[in-house]
Amino acid sequence: MTNKKVYISQKDNYAGAFGLVYRSSANFYFRQSNSFKTTISFMDYWRIKRGISVMVVASTRSMDGKLLMREQLTFKNGSIINFSPDMLRSGIAIFEGAIEIEVFASENMVIPYSAIMAVYEAENSISMVHSYSRTYSPHEVEEGRTISAGEEGCWSILDTQRVASFAIIHNGSDIQPEQSASLELTNVLNKKTSVPFSIPALPPYATFKIIPQHYLPSIISFLDGKPGNAAVSFTLKNSFTRMLVGNNTTDGSEFQVTHSNFNFARHETDNAGEGYAFMLVPPAKFRDLTVVVYPETTKGQYKLETPEGKAYEFKSGERLEITTAPGILKFSKLDGKLPARIVTALTAKAANSNAILPFECSLGVLHKLRPLKGTFWGIVAIGKKYRSRLIIYPMEVLYGEAIDNELQLYLYTQESREPEVRLMHGDEILQLGKGMYLEEIFPRFQETHEDQYGYFYIRCSNYGGMYCYTTLENELGSVSLEHSF
């Protein structure tokens, strides 16, 4: 199965050309047991950024789409909501399903994708991912502002005797009939195999898990102990096709996820013209730090240049993995104009890690079409259970020298509508570029607050070229990295 090509405009995305947005939303895979916890976390950025009051509704559903719980979530006590419904009260040992967060406003919110995080805590690991899927609003369906023909890739598969890969898709508001789908796998030698499989009829709001080992029993020998790649062709009804993708250990002790992205070898995108695109590799002292360029790039020949002066040439369809020093990577296209989107990732383990699974953070590249951005916010761990690093780095290679000599850093919590504030200067700002733990920035604050997820927030009045990452790290050496909103 291959879907009809869809044109994906990055220029429209940058411009916020989504029509009238009075509802924004996000769907998340949700699992709960005595050894596994899912938390849906988000900041009241609608009020903080633009002064917009919103109503938030959370709907918890089973895997077959049945509505089990619907409730209103409020920012009455603080600026952060950390939501994890107790689904084990009825005696269920393990609950698996999905949570939909819907946000409603009487003003145009501009972006229909809510900026929300999911945090997954397994026995030995922690992992996070930002919003990936959403159910379209009726007016978006009527206006044709939908992408439901799924050509999704950028999914690293690590299958071994101890590890199984998986992907999660969420159907929308109508029945999706039974369908023939296809799975294309790529190994470290860039050898490919295509596997057809069936997806049963999906009821409205159903969640479906794709496990490659079920469809290709020889996948472990095909990968031969090295990371590979998967891409999927499928269709949904009235739902955005982005998938949750990841790997878990077969004993359930570790679980690491990121999100898929468009297969740009099949979908189309606009171009960024001549010149370079850039990617930041943060100086965070990870172990086994690897940069991944997924194989689903616009057709053509490319070159990647590292901070050490090494150069790698690759073409569409090839998965490229390199180790590199921290710094700025440069991408160019050797046979035409640079596409607006090249999907990349960072993958690594903590320096002191005994973890089996690395984190993987799906990213992309920055180029001259990306507009200046003045506000950033991202999740951090508050309290003693987990630690967080905050990395704020000026992309001077693209936006010129950072001229701000002070930075006002806000920390929002679930306990107060007002933030903690720290004004940083000179050398402190330089240190943020290398990464600082939250307790180094707000030392007493960390000691006096209960364990929770909060959010940092910065507003840059004079410089719009910052790039930010945060981490969540546990005491066992598991780490997760995500870029900011």
Residue ranges of predicted features:
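Gly/Pro-rich, tryptophan- and cysteine-flecked surface segments typical
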Residues: 1-485
